[in-house]
């Protein structure tokens, strides 16, 4: 979910630094009831707790978009919902920002070849509304915000399993075409 968002922002505004928070549906390695786990927070009941934990997403971005290596950090908050997550990225850029400029960049990107990967919504929806959405990121333009001239916040929904499965199908199609 973070990669398409970071790509659009970096291409359009040149990200200097940022911090992401993923509000993530609980996962299969979490406990249903309080139990044992090497991470004491993940040992707590997933269905009854907000669980702060680490994420590799911010570091992986540097592998996907080399110009962002070391510029993003992040955390995950596992929440008691079974599916659909939200990533929020607070970022500073070299170029001046406005809510309109940010939303326009995402809307233009979503109309191109990448429309299967990134979508935008202007509707005030909640997590369940994105269940089985095939896009990797759905930018919620109603949540875009700017402070000053170069600090912004973007929010993007994603159905982690379904979006990933759709990208794997895209790769299979591509491999079939080139073979």
Question: How does the language model describe each region?
Answer:
Residues 8-11, 105-109, 170-174:
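Short, solvent-exposed amphipathic alpha-helical segments in soluble enzyme
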Residues 7, 33-36, 169:
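Short, glycine/charged-enriched secondary-structure capping and boundary segments
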Residues 14-17, 22-155:
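C-terminal substrate-binding/catalytic lobe of Rossmann-fold NAD(P)-dependent oxidoreductases
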Residues 1, 98, 163-164:
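Secondary-structure boundary/capping motif
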Residues 1-13:
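Alpha-helical support elements that line or immediately flank enzyme active sites
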Residues 103, 146-179:
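C-terminal catalytic/substrate-binding lobe primarily of soluble NAD(P)-dependent oxidoreductases
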